[in-house]
């Protein structure tokens, strides 16, 4: 899904599957596009929105907010698969956003490839707004790499809770499909427990 200044852009279609683009309300200083990636259609909508903003609001700054970066996990060539992140980064860089705000770039490769990228710190949001509303026994990361990255990045959060992680075995000849998954919990009893 794509939003311009909080309003959904390009979510309707004509009978032939072409998107219906309604004129968005524009701000006088900064226009924010928010990419909530669901499919490649959202990237086409972003390109259309950006072109519209260039023509109808050329003097205003353009900001892109992306909680999730599409193709961030394709940060290198794997077997016969292309380095998709590089080409998506080219698409974003050609749009010349003044700033791109991202919740998690996944790897340093994203930061190296994308111009004007700033990472959002979501630790305080988790601590102040999410955790008070839920009861958790531990934090679970999907794999060892995520555990190593986020226990350093979200130190306050990880000091308050026990941490467990998953261990994946992938079939790289089959698009990285997970063949086996186990949970590494060391001495933590997982029965009837909840995690974030």
Listing of model-derived features with the role each one plays in the protein:
Residues 1-196:
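PRPP-associated nucleotide enzymes
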């Amino acid at each position: 899904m794509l939003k311009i200044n909080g309003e959904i852009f390009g979510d309707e279609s004509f009978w032939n599957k072409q998107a219906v683009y309604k004129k968005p309300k524009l701000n006088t200083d900064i226009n924010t596009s928010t990419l909530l990636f669901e499919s490649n259609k959202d990237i086409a909508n972003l390109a259309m929105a950006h072109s519209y903003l260039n023509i109808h609001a050329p003097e205003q700054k353009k900001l892109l907010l992306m909680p999730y970066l599409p193709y961030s996990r394709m940060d290198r060539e794997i077997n016969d698969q292309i380095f998709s992140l590089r080409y998506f980064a080219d698409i974003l860089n050609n749009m010349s956003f003044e700033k791109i705000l991202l919740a998690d770039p996944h790897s340093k490769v994203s930061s190296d490839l994308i111009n004007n990228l700033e990472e959002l710190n979501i630790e305080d949001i988790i601590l102040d707004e999410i955790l008070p509303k839920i009861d958790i026994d531990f934090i679970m990361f999907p794999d060892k790499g995520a555990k190593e990255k986020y226990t350093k990045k979200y130190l306050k959060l990880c000091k308050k809770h026990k941490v467990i992680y998953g261990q994946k075995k992938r079939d790289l000849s089959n698009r990285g499909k997970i063949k086996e998954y186990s949970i590494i919990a060391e001495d933590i009893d997982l029965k009837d427990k909840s995690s974030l």
